[in-house]
Every structure is written in C-alpha cells, then in structure tokens.
Amino acid sequence: MLATSTLNRVMIVELGLAALVPGALVGAHYGVQIARPLWGHGSDAGGRRTPWILGGVALLAAAVTGAALAVAVMADSFAIGLGLAIVDFILIGFGVGAAGTSLLALIASYTPDARRPATAMLVWLMMILGIAITGLATGRFLDPFSMDRLIAVTAAVALLATAVAVLALAGVEKGTLPAPPAGATRSFETFRAGLADAWHDPEARRFTVFVFVSMIAYSMQDLILEPYAGLVFGMTPGETTTLSGVQNGGVLAGMLLGGLGGTAFHRRFPAVLKHLGVTGCLLSAAALLALAGAASGSHAWPLRANVFALGFANGLFAVAAVASMMALAGAGGPTRTGLRMGLWGAAQGLGFGLGGFLGAAAVDAMRLAGAPGSAAYAGVFLIEAAGFTASAALAVRISMPHRVPEGGERRDAAAPRWNSRRAPA
C-alpha cells in the first residue's frame, strides 16, 4: 500500500514528476512476479514454507523503507534517487512474490476442501483490513509532511508488519513437507521438470490462462473509473474518491457471500466453486456493460449502485478464484503445491499489471484517434466485459479435483467430465 499509493502520490505531487515515473516503478514490481514459480519451488524443496514467508516479508520491509529513502533522494538528485528506486521496487516485487506464494501454498496445504471458500474470504478480508489500517495510521502520522517523516513512518510500518508476521506464523507449520522424490533437489533442472509437469496438466494450464485473462479484465478499470466519473458525471475529486469506497464495499459483500455460501454448500454441491466463479465473471461483465451504456452522460444513472454491483461481482469472482487455486495447487502433490501456486501467482501479477496499463493506454489511444472522452471510456469497459465473458467460458471448462469420500466416488453433478484426481489431505 505504501509503495503503490503513498510513494506514488509523493512522486507526482510533492516532487512534481510525470506519472510515468511511479507507473514504471510499480510496473517493475509487477513484472518480477514472473519469478513466483521459482519461489514456490524453493519452498516445496526446502521442506518448510515459514522461512520463505518470513524471508519475503523481511525483504519487502527493507525494500519499502529503501524506496521511501530513494524518493527522498530524488528531491536532491533525481538520477541517483531513480536508480535506487528501481532496485528497491524490484526487491519489493521479489519480497511480495516469495512471501505471498509460500503463504498461499501453506494455506492450501492445511485447508480442507469444504473450508476453502471461507478461507479465501478471510485471506482477502485480512488483506483489505491491513490496507485500511495502514492507510489510516500512516495518513495520521505523515502530517505535517516531510521527507524525514515519510522515511520514519515507512520504517516503523515495515518493522511492525515484520513483527506481526513472525508472531502470526509461530507454531503454525508443524513438521515438514513430505520428502521430495529420490534425487530431487532445488536445481533448475528439477524446477523446469516441475513447471513442465504443471503446464502439461490440462486443468492447471487452463486455470493459468483463466487467471491471466480474468486479471487483465479485473484491473483494466483500476486507473480509469474515477476519471470516467469525473468526466462523464461531473463528480468532484472528493466524490470520485468515495466511489472507490463504494466499490470496495461491494467487493467485501461479494466475498462474504461467496465465502460463506461456498462453504455452506460445498458438500452438497461440489461444483459450487466453479459456479461462483462463472457467476462472478458474468455479473462483472454485465456491470461493465451498464457502465459503458451510462457513458451517454445521463446524470440520472445510478452510478454508485452500478459501481457497487461491479465490486460485488468482482468479490464473488475473487473468492472463487482463490479457493479454486488452493484446490488445484494440491492436485500436483504436496511437493508441487508451491510451484503451482507460484505459476498462478505469476499469471495474476502479470495480468494485473498489464490490465492497468492497457486500460489507461486504450483510453489515450482512442482519444488520440478522435473519439470523445466518454466513448473512449465506454470502449474500455466493453473490452473488459468481453474479457470477463471469455474468462467465464474458460472457467466452465476447468475440472476441479476432489477427494473421494469413504462411501464411494463423488462426482460433480453439474459437469460429467469432472476429473477423479485426488487432492492430498
């Protein structure tokens, strides 16, 4: 949050830099997410995931503090500060990738099938809660603003986050992972073999494409929704900022419904995760079509309700995607969970970063081509809707693994082609 929001604002407002500078730095942080499969493989081969999680958090904390220092240096020497910032944002990406991939693999290893929707909901809720608390606390302590205060507050938040991570993980991981096959090491050859195995699994491959396409669609409106509301509906900066809160409220509602509903109905309807994911994608497409239709500029359009609906659909889709990720990650066996989770984390990071860039670039390109501003924004929303529709079509074709209960084989009533691979306990 500090790296992608607070430092972004300081570079643009306080230092007067072009938005391209922080945009490129944040893009570098997303770009290195392609290394996530390697971090996941390391935690698989190492026998324990906790060291990778804490190591990633420590690297993230140091890099965020370094990034704040680099921004302060920019005020006196832009070239030196930019060089430091590039290194720090790359390290931020590595820290996020190592910690996030290993944490999700740990959660997937310990969570029973029936509890995965609720677990995915809790993970997202805790992430949003952490962002909210950090934003409120740092906003209070950063005023009156100075570069020295920025560095001090960032360092304090980083130190506190590291301490919380250490306490939260104490005693969670009992024992070690099952021993890898004889001769398996952390070598690059072993990593390549594991990655090839995951890619040759049709369900894992389809899910990778699904994550990439859906995250592009998910993030394309990230940088354009507030400008759209200001241009088409004449909203003030304060009003468009509250619109973001309305959307996040919808996300929370969708996650709660998806998490609780998915957990409650998982045993009776094994295909509930697939149905939630498809429903979330289609509802997201419908909400985006409505936003595109509202570009005519009718101030009577219920924009807040439309944005809440978009957030709700996104939340429903997100919970189903994370829970499905946990289930599919375990299908490769406990010594491949981290690598598979890393593969999908890489697809998520690259898709999210690319989507935000493409959304903003598409608006600029259409306006340069002579399209009115409202039509340009509507065009991007239509592209997003098409992306979510394609994601729904991909999700329908993904067969989720399931455990076979003692009473006999359980099949997915909604999908005769549901596979019979067993996820490990």
Model-derived regions: residue spans:
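Glycine-rich segments within core transmembrane alpha-helices of 12-TM secondary carriers
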Residues: 32-34, 117-142, 251, 344-359
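A membrane-interface helix-boundary motif in multi-pass transporters
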Residues: 49-51, 80-81, 139-159, 269-275, ...
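C-terminal ends and interior cores of transmembrane alpha-helices
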Residues: 54-79, 279-298
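Intracellular juxtamembrane helix-capping segments at the cytosolic ends
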Residues: 96-111, 316-333
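Juxtamembrane intracellular "pre-TM" segments in multi-pass secondary transporters
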Residues: 175-208, 232, 407-425
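Helix-loop boundary and gating motifs at the non-cytosolic
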Residues: 1-33, 205-210, 214-233, 240-243, ...
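Central cavity-lining transmembrane alpha-helices of secondary-active solute carriers
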Residues: 22-44, 245-258
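C-terminal transmembrane helical hairpin of 12-TM major facilitator-type secondary transporters
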Residues: 273-321
